[in-house]
């Protein structure tokens, strides 16, 4: 690892020296080269122009915590999102040349050609990636300056990513075929797939994110339908859920499955039907039981969820918890009258 880091350090210095236009600039640069990889990354981050900093941080947050590599088109749309504006996304603000996205993060990111395994019809795609694994390690360490570190703490970064994804999905409050959404809005599939994963980590800590979750679940039916026609988190193997013609399940169901306890509390306070049918697990209680969210299971039961409700993949909540090995939930359901078999 030490040798690899030295090569990485040398590569960064060569990148810095490329900007020297004459001998004097070269001398000055050589005299002030950082001695370690940490110092090198710190200098690169501090050297990002102020007008580029917001976009650079967002790109680095996505790449540091992303569940999968970002296509360049996804990254371009991610930095267009304005979570504070009335119109969260406007395509006219996309970069004319997507490859220019490299300028935001200097030596920290690279473009890589990769095989496409998604919905793009082309054989090859271009992905934006961190230039080296040591960058992720540095950004998630305790060695950053405080004013930068706060952006890369897990909860803050994942709250930011989830909010961007939800803001993007809220823009899709129109009736469009799923195929057209994927073609016109490159970040839509990623947002639909991952927003709830990021939100589950940060929901209870970030009021802005809570507001976006509430708006998404309660106020924009087309955005909601488009999201779950792109991806159903309870059926991740299904690439085309919309083709089966089944309507998405209730907001309470997906919030329960995703572990969003604050959203579950809010939806119940607004009169959501705790026993509503729909989804792979048939109801919110079975979804939460199968996913292992014991606090949500307890909450749903306290609000009148039928502990022996039938339906779904496992038949009932107890079987879902047993099948997934969630012993604490099994004990909880049994204590609330769940029957081990139903006649």
Where are these regions (language model features)?
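Ankyrin repeat boundary signal
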Residues: 274-277, 307-310, 342-343
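Ankyrin repeat domain, specifically the short helix-to-loop turn at the C-terminus of the second helix
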Residues: 265-273, 298-306, 331-339
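Leucine-rich solenoid repeat scaffolds
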Residues: 318-323, 327-343
């Amino acid at each position: 690892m030490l040798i690899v880091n030295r090569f990485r350090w040398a590569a960064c210095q060569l990148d810095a020296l490329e900007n020297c236009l004459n001998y004097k600039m070269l001398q000055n640069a050589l005299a002030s080269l950082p001695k370690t990889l940490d110092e090198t990354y710190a200098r690169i981050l501090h050297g990002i122009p102020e007008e580029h900093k917001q976009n650079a941080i967002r790109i680095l947050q996505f790449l540091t915590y992303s569940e999968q590599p970002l296509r360049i088109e996804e990254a371009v749309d991610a930095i267009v999102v304005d979570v504070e504006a009335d119109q969260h996304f406007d395509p006219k603000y996309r970069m004319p040349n997507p490859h220019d996205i490299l300028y935001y993060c200097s030596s920290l990111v690279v473009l890589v050609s990769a095989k496409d395994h998604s919905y793009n019809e082309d054989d090859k795609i271009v992905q934006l990636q961190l230039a080296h694994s040591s960058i992720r390690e540095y950004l998630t360490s305790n060695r950053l300056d405080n004013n930068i570190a706060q952006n890369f703490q897990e909860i803050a970064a994942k709250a930011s990513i989830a909010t961007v994804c939800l803001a993007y999905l809220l823009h899709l409050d129109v009736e469009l075929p799923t195929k057209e959404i994927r073609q016109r809005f490159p970040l839509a599939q990623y947002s639909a797939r991952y927003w709830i994963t990021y939100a589950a980590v940060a929901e209870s800590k970030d009021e802005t994110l809570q507001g976006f979750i509430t708006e998404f679940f309660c106020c924009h039916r087309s955005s909601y339908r488009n999201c779950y026609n792109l991806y159903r988190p309870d059926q991740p193997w299904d690439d085309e859920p919309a083709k089966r013609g089944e309507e998405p399940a209730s907001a309470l169901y997906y919030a329960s499955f995703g572990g969003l306890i604050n959203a579950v509390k809010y939806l119940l306070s607004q009169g959501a039907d705790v026993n509503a049918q729909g989804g792979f697990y048939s109801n919110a209680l079975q979804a939460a039981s199968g996913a292992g969210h014991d606090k949500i299971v307890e909450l749903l039961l306290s609000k009148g969820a039928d502990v022996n409700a039938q339906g779904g993949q496992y038949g009932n909540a107890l079987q879902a918890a047993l099948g997934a090995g969630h012993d604490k939930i099994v004990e909880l359901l049994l204590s609330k009258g769940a029957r081990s078999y139903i006649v």
